[in-house]
Amino acid sequence: MGCFESKPSEQHQPTAVRGCTDIFWLVVYILFWIALLVIAVFSFVYGNPLRVINGYDSFGNTCGVSSNEKFSHFPLSGMNTKDKPYVFFLDIKELRQTLKICVKECPKKEIGNAMELYRYYEERDTKYCRYDFNMSLLTAPDASGPKYFAFAGPCPKFPVYESSSVLHRCIPSGKNAPTKVVKDMYALVNSFGAAQQVFSDIYKTWPTVLLLVGLSLIFSIILIMMLHWLTAIISWLICIFVAVASIGITAVLWWSYYKQKHSIDTDTKLSYLEELVRNETTIYVLAILATCIMIILLVVIYYLREKLSGLAALFEEAGKCMLQIPGLAGPPVLAFIALAVFLSFWMVVIVCLATANYPNVKPLLPFTQLKENPNKTEAAIKPDMSVNNNTYKSFDLVEYPEADFLRHMLWIYIIGLVWTSEFIFACQQLVISGAVAYWYFRKPTDTPVLNAIAKLVKYHLGSVAKGSFIITLFKIPRLILTYLYAKLKRHQQEGSECASCCLKCCICSFWLLEKFIRYLNHNAYTVIAIESVNFCPAAKIAWNALVTNALQVATINGIGDLVLFLGKLAVAALCGLISILMLRDNPDVHFYMAPVIIITLFSFFVAHIVLSLYEMVVDTLFLCVCEDRTINGNSGRWKQSNLAHLLGESPEQDAVEAPMQVVELTPITKQPFSVQSLQMTEIDDKGAV
């Protein structure tokens, strides 16, 4: 039995009018997105990346911004700190309790007394006292007393050491700075959440991220053009390009690791900052992974060299289809725009969630817990009962504790990233499948791509949501297990080898299941586009077709898809290589591997969208050829196709194409199916659900 059987019928009965599929899953997907939007609103209210990147003073002002929120009872809040991007601590020995202010620059030299502080203010127009303090008071004879220079301000305690900016915080860097003080300052910076630091670096590099993701689209389009015009040698070119790119990115990673390690070993103070140490560790791990992947790719390319010549016919046939349907270039562009908009939205929300905090009152002096003397007659001086005694105990400042209730929403957005990305990919796949199937069976004069898009929006969004959710269902557990395995490996103890082995097995199992389901989904979308059935019945039909033609499937999707996958890797590797060269010397970014990883992943997504065009065209043509061969035998259109090679036949270029069949066809589901059903989709949708 072939892909489809023909079944004679006494009278022609076309299939039912196309109706909506998997409506329940469309409702679930819409509700999920409503939840994402609600979380996004809260993240925009509470999140402020600049508050983490630049820091804030003790009055609630974020440093380096033009407008700040004004709080009642805090007259120094709501200030314009655009020209004051750095945080300065008035007493570096009491970092948790001292007053913080925003300053124009960190001290360029050591300041030892009040007059030197005033001269520095006159020379460099940089004020290291509280905003409302009159600096001319420092010239008074009694200015050197403790009333002006304390951890509560209004001016800093001496000496003020020469400092440099680390994450926009002034940290002593002069030779006279005590080691303990420097360590305490770095410990304070390290106390910021790792997620905050990572997403802060991503926020600072967003123009570079957008630039290189856009560049990945250009690289992918160039690769598509090469697939069309250089079919005879494109397989070799892709393999050579992948080999060069993998070697290049591996060499750059090892060189970056050497430079990072050398700089940390040379300057011991740099080792106090966990971001730089984390950067070194990440580069080291990525360099090892890149080396392993490079070796695997070179071995695979070496063994594929004898089979690459057979792919010319495959890509030539796909190129012929795309040449006759120029509209096929539209779905990848639309998918890229949709993915770019979603990823931009996702990045903004995820950064706001990671930096979410809320204003709170903090007492500066820890004397509010002290009780008043109950026997006031024993006091030498009677207290003034008209004054609130709490004013002598403390005065309040503003701090921003983390909004933990929003931090947990990060997991929902991680699920949303996978599900929505897969949803966009699935929409593209179904549109391409429908357009190619209509072109193969009907050869219409109108635009099959627009027709396929219309049918997707009207009827099949539910099936797309279900198919993408199934992929998510297997991918999320694999990501969680991979994370657990990394933590177990980092803190590996004696006796954990068994757990490590089990995790590896589970990760591999979920990876294999995900790849299998993803491949089955590709073909299920083709059946949905043709027959308008729900996702599960369509997957069953596609599975039967694949099993029946297992040898041909292995040939087409084994070698062809592998070469296309190498092309996606090449685009991602090239963009990752460029991002490393652009970001590794950026002084404002400490954990630069975070944006590098984001750029590489997003570039792979973009390349996957564009290059999956060829993949879907080939898969769809294969299913159509299987049906055509079963229905028409050697007189069908497939006999003139280069795909006949892949079906074990010789193409007949001069064969006369048989007319389109008008008899009822019965697919392997044993349910009636007719070519006429394709024509019925043009009928008014009055019978649709």
UniProtKB/Swiss-Prot annotation:
Recorded GO MF terms: transmembrane transporter activity
Carbohydrate-modified residues: N134, N279, N375, N389
Pfam families cross-referenced by the UniProt entry: Choline_transpo
Domain of life of the native organism: Eukaryota
Keywords: Glycoprotein, Membrane, Transmembrane, Transmembrane helix
First-listed, main subcellular location of the protein, grouped into a coarse class: membrane
Transmembrane segments: 23-43, 199-219, 233-255, 283-303, 333-353, 412-432, 461-481, 562-582, 591-611
Keyword Aminoacyl-tRNA synthetase assigned: no
Localization annotation: Membrane
PANTHER family: CHOLINE TRANSPORTER-LIKE (SLC FAMILY 44) (PTHR12385), CHOLINE TRANSPORTER-LIKE PROTEIN (PTHR12385:SF12)
Entry similarity comment: Belongs to the CTL (choline transporter-like) family.
Protein name stated in the entry: Choline transporter-like 1
Organism: Aedes aegypti
Name of the gene this protein is made from: Ctl1
